[in-house]
Each structure stands twice: as structure tokens, then as C-alpha cells.
Curated annotation (Swiss-Prot):
Known cofactor(s): Cu cation
Listed Pfam families: COX2, COX2_TM
Cross-referenced InterPro entries: CcO_II, CcO_II-like_C, CcO_II_C, Copper_CuA, Cupredoxin, Cyt_c_oxidase_su2, Cyt_c_oxidase_su2_TM_dom, Cyt_c_oxidase_su2_TM_sf
Protein's name in the database: Cytochrome c oxidase subunit 2
Organism of this sequence: Macaca fascicularis (Crab-eating macaque)
Record's subcellular location: Mitochondrion inner membrane
Enzyme Commission code(s) on record: 7.1.1.9
Spans within the Mitochondrial matrix topological domain: 46-59
Annotated Gene Ontology cellular component terms: mitochondrial inner membrane; mitochondrion; respiratory chain complex IV
EC class (word): translocase
GO biological process terms held by the UniProt record: ATP synthesis coupled electron transport
């Protein structure tokens, strides 16, 4: 998860997050180069005497500043389209879980395990243990296997929500009357935190998500839920 004063993205826990970090670095490099060139041209303009004020035509320059931005946009767009395709790619999932957003908690349904359903509420400060994270701990965590494709079916019971876990590279809107899906494969066990990322009312800030990722062999032994 994120650390205090952290400037970079969180460590990747899924292949799609690794792709997003790579694209972020690629786009940041392009934007840094553009910013440097613009600042250099601006500094050059401010420190150079205007000796060529009578120039009315410069077709070479016009050609360059028309073609160069188009090339830069293409170089940014192609990796972006690749990542977009990967995020929408749906392979044969090993597990399907339904997540339903409410004001202001989440409901999880394990349809592959006899229709197991439970709610996940934020823990009030009075119930926190030493080492727990304020505004991020829940009473019931969603338990997921690693090294297996998991499909999350996400919807909402009332208003717009968004099921988000940054370290997994997941952010899917929960829309009333609509069932969205996202497929991911976690690569590392651990406890990972997220929050509702769509303003959904007065207690929007008190709607955390906690995913407990465990090895596939342990998960296959039977549901391991903190109920």
C-alpha cells in the first residue's frame, strides 16, 4: 500500500498494474521532454534579441510543429490502446465474485461457494487494534486467490460507486441497473486496501475495500473468510 509522502505509484500486484506503471513511465518521459523543449524555447525567446521581426513565413517550422505533435501523440496512444485492450480482455476465470455497492458499505457474493453472501463495513475507530489503519479496515475482508484469474462482477444498489484497489490496477464503476466486470490475476499474497472512488454521498470517505490475497492451494481447501 502507499506510504506517507510517497510520490510514485504503489507496487504492482498484478500484471495489468505492471503494464500501467510501464505506460505511466513512458508517458511521463514524453511529457518531460515536451516540457523541457517548451521551457528551453521560452528561455531562448526571453534572452535573445528580436532581430528577425520582419519574417512573415516559415513553412519548414510550420511543418515541424504540425507533424511532431502528431508523432508524439501516436507514440503515446499506441501503448495506451494496448493497455486498454488488456484491461478489457476476459479469459476463462477460475472464480467469480459479485460486489454490490451500497451507501456506505459493500456486499460480496461468492456464487461458486453455495451463494455465500456477506457485508463489509468500515471498522469504527473504537474497534481498531494496534497497527490497524484508520478509515481503511473493515469487519469482513474479501478473500481472493493468487495465481488464478478472478472475475469481479460489480454493480450498485443505490447510487454510483467505484470498486478500486490501486495496487491491483483495478477501478470499475458500480452503476445501478448495470453489471460491470473486470478480470485480474494477483501475483503476490498479502492484504491490500482500496476505497470507493466515486463520490456517493455524505459517508463516501468511509467505504473502504480490503482484499486478503492468499495462495491458491489454501483457497481451494475451502472458503477462508473472516466472518
Amino acid at each position: 500500500m502507499a506510504h506517507p509522502v510517497q510520490l510514485s505509484l504503489q507496487d504492482a500486484t498484478s500484471p495489468i498494474m505492471e503494464e500501467l506503471i510501464t505506460f505511466h513511465d513512458h508517458a511521463f518521459m514524453a511529457m518531460s521532454l515536451i516540457s523541457f523543449l517548451v521551457l528551453y524555447a521560452l528561455a531562448l525567446t526571453l534572452t535573445t534579441k528580436l532581430t528577425n521581426t520582419n519574417i512573415t513565413d516559415a513553412q519548414e517550422m510550420e511543418t515541424i510543429w504540425t507533424i511532431l505533435p502528431a508523432v508524439i501523440l501516436i507514440l503515446i496512444a499506441l501503448p495506451s490502446l494496448r493497455v486498454l485492450y488488456l484491461t478489457d480482455e476476459v479469459n476463462d476465470p477460475s472464480l467469480t465474485i459479485k460486489s454490490i455497492g451500497h451507501q456506505w458499505y459493500w456486499t460480496y457474493e461468492y456464487t461458486d461457494y453455495g451463494g455465500l453472501i456477506f457485508n463489509s463495513y468500515m471498522l469504527p475507530p473504537l474497534f481498531l487494534k494496534p497497527g490497524d489503519l484508520r478509515l481503511l479496515e473493515v469487519d469482513n475482508r474479501v478473500v481472493l486467490p493468487i495465481e488464478a484469474p478472478v472475475r469481479m462482477m460489480i454493480t450498485s444498489q443505490d447510487v454510483l460507486h467505484s470498486w478500486t484497489i490501486p495496487t491491483l490496477g483495478l477501478k470499475t464503476d458500480a452503476v445501478p441497473g448495470r453489471l460491470n466486470q473486470t478480470v485480474f490475476t494477483a501475483t503476490r499474497p498479502g492484504v491490500y486496501y482500496g476505497q470507493c472512488s466515486e463520490i456517493c454521498g455524505a459517508n463516501h470517505s468511509f467505504m473502504p475495500i480490503v482484499a486478503d490475497l492468499i495462495p491458491l492451494k489454501i483457497f481451494e481447501m475451502g472458503p477462508v473468510f473472516t466472518l
